[in-house]
Amino acid sequence: MSQLDRRNFLTASAALAASASLGRFAPAQPAAAGWAQLVAGNTAFGLDLYGQLRTEAGNLFLSPFSISAALGMTAAGARGKTLEEMTRLLHFPADAHAAFGNVIRSLNEEADPKKRGFTLSTANALWAQKGYPWRAEYKKLVTDAYSADLFDVDFLSAPEEARGTINTWVMKETRDKIKDLLPPGSVTRDTRLVLTNAIYFKGDWQAPFEKKATKDLPFTLADGTKVEVPLMYRVGSYLYAENDAFQVLDLPYTGRRISMTVILPRKPDGLPAVEKDLTGGKLDAALKTLRYEREVHVHLPRFKVEKSFRLNEPLQALGMKSAFAGADFSGMHTGGEQLDISAVIHKAFVDVNEEGTEAAAATGVVVGTTSVAPPPMPRYFRADRPFLFLIRDNTTGSVLFLGRLTNPKA
């Protein structure tokens, strides 16, 4: 096949999490059909991918859910070896697309933030070369399962205009936080399809950190260097666990459906060992050890992280190879051209600060009312060294965001 017969498409995803202040864990609801396997697979994929990215220096932040959704729409049109590799990479169950539909609808339900106390939305779109022979059944699958919008664009005649249109859509879906997802040169006259996912989350903590309690204090980097950063402080009742290697704290947002879980190694240089050892099973086991503690003294840095990734090499290292060269995406189209993925692009942003709603400040569970009850043993969770954090949907169990903070000032 000549080079002129080879065409490409892009898979892109964008994620934003903006958060503020502190509360209590919401018990997970029984998973709908297909949720459990899909969610476990998404978590496993996210940690596999994180394992490839963790060798990069500095802070990290990504949305495993966003990347999995974008690749899921792509896999829906894959066949043969390409489909086998993508299914294995994504840990997809047999009913993955239908299960994704259930999860996406659950995440987007009651979109009014006044009803559930936070804003969470996920949006998918398929940007197709107009006039190209796309299969109607493929379009129906991605619209039904992934709630994707379909847009006809003209990559052939106006690739830069198409890129601008897609980037504008991403900006709108992420409330102007993710800009220029597709960089110059990523869309060309050879592009035939771009698949995008955007996920946006903004939540207030159940009970706020008071700004007057935030102080500039030392944060110890992995090499022992100390930097002054704003450390927020609050004492209250939280889900907490610890072992010899790390401490775990769960910090739910207003509405209690979404929470941030922080995994804090005991030592400033202990993060690489925790990262290397973390699997979906071990993460689940750690979460199951969380117990309410009546008095937890929490120090947490105020921070922002923005990261961009071109995921071609990490995905190929995990076994998704044929999708980038010699792919079989015949489930998408009836054209005679060879379609390969040219790039998988992901961009994510997180903002953590003190802000919150004072209306729901009662967060603890008081056990025992007799005068002889022993006083609670105070716990101290001082995140003044590198740590892992993830933002989870407690209803479906989905890991929406996953990150690492090594330096709040970076």
Q: Model-derived features: where do they sit?
A:
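Primarily short, surface-exposed interaction patches in extracytoplasmic proteins
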Residues: 87-90
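C-terminal segment of N-terminal export signals and the immediately downstream linker at the start
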Residues: 23-45, 49
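Alpha-helical support elements that line or immediately flank enzyme active sites
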Residues: 73-77
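Short phosphate-coordinating micro-motif centered on Lys-Gly-acidic
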Residues: 70
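N-terminal secretory signal peptides and thylakoid transit peptides that target proteins
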Residues: 2-16
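Non-catalytic, conformational "gating/processing" segments within enzyme and secreted inhibitor domains
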Residues: 57, 96-268, 273-274, 284-375
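N-terminal targeting/tethering segments
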Residues: 43-63
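C-terminal soluble interaction/assembly domains
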Residues: 348, 354-410
